[in-house]
């Protein structure tokens, strides 16, 4: 299983700092100067329910449904991370429908469709920007293999 980002709803305050950190981390110049409502394209989304808030992001599925349904194979696995090859994406939204976690979205930027999903900030040596920016530490990068081993040790 692949590592992915998980949110603790008990700690999430719905501040959307994770979304801003994601947008900035995926901009070419890594600053807020070019962010506008039209270009605010986060790969993590804060969802607000009646009694809780939590962040939703890609679970990096082993057999990713989003990749399976893409008619142009725009979603490919690189070094254990599912990524979107934007040049290939046709904006059909099949990936959005197929994702069981609601973690995919297709947006339009300058008349071009872009499919967005979390890539765990693979371009950052320090790891996911959202995890680093969360003021309440509600986000963490979960490695299912490590978690399973810890649970087995705890039971022993």
What does each model-found stretch correspond to?
Residues 1-156:
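Non-ligating segments of multi-cofactor redox enzymes
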């Amino acid at each position: 299983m692949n590592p992915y980002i998980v949110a603790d709803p008990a700690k999430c305050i719905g501040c959307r700092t994770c979304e801003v950190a994601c947008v900035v981390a995926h901009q070419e110049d890594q600053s807020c100067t070019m962010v506008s409502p039209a270009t605010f394209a986060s790969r993590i989304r804060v969802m607000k329910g009646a009694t809780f808030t939590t962040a939703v992001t890609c679970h990096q599925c082993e057999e990713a449904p989003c990749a399976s349904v893409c008619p142009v194979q725009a979603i490919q696995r690189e070094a254990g991370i599912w990524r979107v090859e934007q040049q290939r994406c046709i904006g059909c939204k099949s990936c959005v429908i197929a994702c069981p976690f609601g973690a995919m979205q297709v947006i339009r930027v300058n008349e071009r469709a872009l499919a967005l999903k979390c890539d765990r900030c693979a371009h950052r040596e320090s790891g996911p920007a959202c995890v680093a920016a969360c003021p309440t530490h509600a986000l963490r990068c979960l490695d299912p293999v490590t978690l399973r081993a810890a649970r087995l040790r705890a039971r022993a």
